[in-house]
Amino acid sequence: IPHGKTQAEYSALDTQGVLKPFVTRYPELQAHTLQPEIYKEGLYHDCDDDITQMAKMILSHEPVATGITPLQLTDENFGSIPRYYIECTEDRAVTPFIQQKMYTETPCNKVYKINTSHSPFFSRPQELCDIFFEIAAL
């Protein structure tokens, strides 16, 4: 996401993502959560059911500020670090359209594609680690 933009701006453009109707807002906490009934379809559709059950125990509130605060990026910091993106081609939470928009507007050294849901660390951990090892060797 480029300098001065917010995650919420990109989320608003994502008409195919399945999570929005399942967000519960807690204004008093300045936070929101996902309703558990969307976990499987929205985050873990290619994972074993025990992963979804574990998620129900560990996923928690997310601060609203992280999505509405414009990013402040500088060439000295963000611009000096090589960037790589791992596109999850079957992601239903942050759809490929939005992922492509993000990495196109904030160019990367390389884009990797992995045929997974939003959670490749659970569904394809070895393939994800192989990508990390390749990046680390660059």
Regions found by a protein language model. Name each.
Residues 31-37, 50, 82:
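Short, basic/glycine-rich phosphate-binding loops at helix/coil junctions
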Residues 7-13, 99-101, 126-127:
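Short, glycine/charged-enriched secondary-structure capping and boundary segments
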Residues 125-133:
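Short, amphipathic alpha-helical "lid/cap" segments that border enzyme active or binding sites
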Residues 36-37, 133-138:
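Plant-biased detector of terminal regions, especially N-terminal secretory signal peptides
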Residues 1-36, 66-67, 72:
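Flexible "cap/lid" loop of the alpha/beta hydrolase fold
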Residues 50-51, 57-121, 125, 137:
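Conserved serine/cysteine hydrolase catalytic core
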Residues 37-46:
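Helix-loop "lid/cap" segments that line or gate small-molecule binding pockets
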Residues 36-38, 113-114:
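Short glycine-enriched loop/turn motifs at secondary-structure junctions
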